[in-house]
C-alpha cells in the first residue's frame, strides 16, 4: 500500500487499530521518532502490544509519554477498551500457544488481560453492543481445530459472545499456519501487514 495510499484512505476522524510490533526500540524514550511518524499520519491509532515491543511499559508511563510529547492521536489498548462506531474494541497481546515451556503461566496471564479488557468494555459501554477482539498472537492454531479443542482465549471469546477476532504475528512462510474463517461461531482473520499486502482492512 505505502504511505501515500494510507494518507489517501484514512481520514482524521477514522480509527486505525495496529495489533503490535511498531518499533525496534528497547525503551520508550528511544521510540520517539516512531511515535512521531505515527502521530503525523492521519487518523487515530490504537496500539496493541506485540512480542517485539520491548519499549512497552505501564499504561501510566505510556500515557504520560504521549502527553509530554504532544502526540494527539495515539492510544493504547491495554486492560481497557474503546467504543468506536457503536462497537466495543477489546484486546491483548496473547501468547504463543505452542510454547509448552511457558504456556500455562503466560497464557493464563494474557487471557486474564483479555477478560479485563472485555469486562471494562461491558462496564463502560453496556452489553447491548458488538464486541470485536484484537490480539497480536493467534488465539488458536490448526491443531486445535483438527482436534476440536478450544484454547483459553477461544473459551473467553465464546464466554462473552464475541464473534470476530483479528490477529497478527504470522509473517511470510508462517502465513500457512493461520486459522481463518468461522470456528465454533467466531470469525478469525489474520491481519499481519504483509499478509494484507500492506493494505488496510476495513473492519
Identify the residue ranges that each predicted region occupies.
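Generic alpha-helical propensity signal that fires on short helical segments
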Residues: 34, 61-65, 100, 107, ...
Amino acid at each position: 500500500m505505502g504511505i501515500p495510499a494510507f494518507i489517501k484512505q484514512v481520514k482524521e476522524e477514522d480509527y486505525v487499530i495496529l495489533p503490535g510490533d511498531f518499533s525496534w526500540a528497547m525503551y520508550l524514550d528511544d521510540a520517539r521518532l516512531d511515535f512521531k511518524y505515527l502521530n503525523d499520519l492521519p487518523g487515530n491509532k490504537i496500539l496493541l502490544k506485540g512480542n517485539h515491543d520491548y519499549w512497552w511499559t505501564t499504561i501510566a508511563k505510556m500515557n504520560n509519554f504521549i502527553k509530554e510529547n504532544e502526540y494527539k492521536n495515539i492510544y493504547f489498548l491495554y486492560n481497557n477498551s474503546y467504543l468506536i462506531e457503536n462497537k466495543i474494541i477489546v484486546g491483548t497481546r496473547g501468547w504463543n500457544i505452542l510454547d509448552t515451556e511457558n504456556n500455562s503461566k503466560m497464557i493464563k496471564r494474557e487471557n486474564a488481560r483479555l477478560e479485563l479488557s472485555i469486562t471494562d468494555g461491558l462496564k463502560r459501554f453496556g452489553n447491548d453492543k458488538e464486541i470485536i477482539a484484537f490480539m497480536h498472537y493467534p488465539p488458536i492454531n490448526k491443531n486445535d481445530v483438527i482436534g476440536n479443542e478450544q484454547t483459553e482465549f477461544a473459551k473467553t471469546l465464546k464466554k462473552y459472545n464475541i464473534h470476530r477476532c483479528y490477529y497478527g504475528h504470522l509473517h511470510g512462510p508462517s502465513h500457512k499456519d493461520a486459522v481463518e474463517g468461522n470456528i465454533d461461531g467466531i470469525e478469525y482473520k489474520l491481519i499481519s501487514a504483509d499478509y494484507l499486502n500492506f493494505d488496510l482492512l476495513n473492519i
